[in-house]
């Protein structure tokens, strides 16, 4: 009897999933947006890869908007790839916007930029300008923070706590 109950439960779950899949695209109360990391956006230079990957996604989900990340871990997606990806999605009636993840190396304890370092600030600005060149709208991934404790940071921190110092630095970085 337990086995029959499990089968009935499994069939009920599959029926619900099937119903959700069939009715996908009939969204009335919300829009669906997805975020694509720079690693995958960079692969979009291969139109066959893009098309086959998008076919898998679009069979499962009716997407209204896609955020194409332009930078992550010092990988900057080139202009030609971004233009090709934007054109591909626009032809399908999908809005595009940009995204940025300000990391240097995620695998190294989420190494981020040091916002008191003028060279890092210059790179961050170049990434933002590169993204703004392609998109009227972009978002920052949740890596807009710093955990840097370089000599520059230690000197700039002075007598402030790390929390006070980082709040000050990131507020200023966000504004400028």
Where are these regions (language model features)?
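Bacterial N-terminal signal peptides
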Residues: 9-19
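N-terminal secretory/membrane-targeting segments
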Residues: 5, 22-23
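Bacterial N-terminal signal peptides that target proteins for export
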Residues: 1-9
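Glycan-processing catalytic domains of CAZymes
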Residues: 24-176
């Amino acid at each position: 009897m337990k086995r029959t109950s499990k089968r009935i439960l499994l069939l009920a779950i599959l029926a619900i999933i099937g119903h959700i899949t069939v009715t996908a695209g009939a969204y009335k109360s919300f829009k669906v947006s997805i975020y694509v990391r720079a690693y995958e956006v960079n692969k979009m230079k291969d139109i066959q890869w893009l098309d086959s990957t998008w076919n898998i996604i679009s069979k499962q989900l009716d997407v209204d908007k896609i955020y194409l990340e332009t930078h992550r871990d010092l990988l900057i997606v080139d202009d030609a790839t971004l233009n090709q990806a934007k054109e591909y999605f626009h032809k399908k009636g999908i809005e595009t916007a940009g995204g940025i993840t300000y990391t240097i190396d995620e695998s190294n304890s989420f190494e981020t930029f040091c916002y008191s370092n003028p060279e890092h600030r210059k790179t961050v600005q170049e990434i933002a300008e590169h993204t703004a060149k392609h998109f009227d709208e972009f978002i920052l991934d949740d890596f807009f923070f710093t955990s840097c404790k370089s000599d520059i940071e230690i000197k700039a921190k002075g007598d402030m706590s790390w929390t006070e110092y980082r709040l000050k630095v990131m507020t200023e970085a966000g504004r400028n």
